[in-house]
Amino acid sequence: MKKLYPILLSVSVLALSGCVTEGSRTVEVQKVTSYNTAYNGVKAPISVGKFDNRSSYNNGVFSDGVDQLGNQAKTILVSHLQQSGRFSVLDRTNMSESATEAKIKGQKQKLKAANYVVTGDVTEFGRKTVGDQQLFGILGRGKQQVAYAKVTLNVVNTQTSEVVYSVQGAGEYNLSNREVLGFGSTAGYDSTLNGKVLDLAIREAVNNLVSGVESGQWKPSN
């Protein structure tokens, strides 16, 4: 009987390993409305300034002092501004790295100056979980995670410090699951909703910024 233990153990391990599944897929990334559309107007040189979290989210006495939401928002904004095809977006975050590479190459940098600085603020951000049940939960119950974000973008003239144009964008993202008679999907806390709703709000703000340019409400200079 003792000789059977190693065999049974090996079979058990193989059976458990056979239950493990692995899968992957690519997900299409949403882009601004003007992405890959024709444009013959002025592409004003702009840089992205500070993007701060002005909401109450992660700004309490127990926060670590690192503006993770603002840093994430700035990265998203740079990407959407560039993909809009309406601006010449200048990088000011990796200045030392760019200077190092130019030095290694033996070339002198010829930095381009920005006519405008785009600053941003997360003015509203929040998450909540709402639930419902049918016939006291006997016929089913559900849970929905909801994330909401609102951002403001200000375009500042670098020569005069005048705020020449302002736009806002807001978005809401939700994740739902429902269980009926003990059967159904269950979903834990999804931290990716923060990034998704932030991307949605900033994308809407950039769409509004592009609309302002194309409608003539803001006429950027080159």
Segments (PLM) and residue ranges:
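Bacterial N-terminal signal peptides that target proteins for export
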Residues: 1-8
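Interfaces that engage single-stranded nucleic acids at replication/repair/recombination sites
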Residues: 8-10, 204
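A generic structural signal for short, non-catalytic loop/turn and secondary-structure boundary residues
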Residues: 9, 39-41, 82, 115-118, ...
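Bacterial Sec-type N-terminal signal peptides, specifically the leucine/valine-rich hydrophobic h-region
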Residues: 13-16
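A structural "domain/chain start" motif
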Residues: 19-90, 94-102, 175, 181-187, ...
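Surface-exposed short loop/turn segments
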Residues: 21-25, 97-164, 174-177, 183-188
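Soluble periplasmic/extracytoplasmic beta-strand elements of cell-envelope proteins
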Residues: 45-52, 76-80, 88-90, 115-123, ...
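Short beta-strand edge segments in extracellular beta-sheet folds
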Residues: 170-172
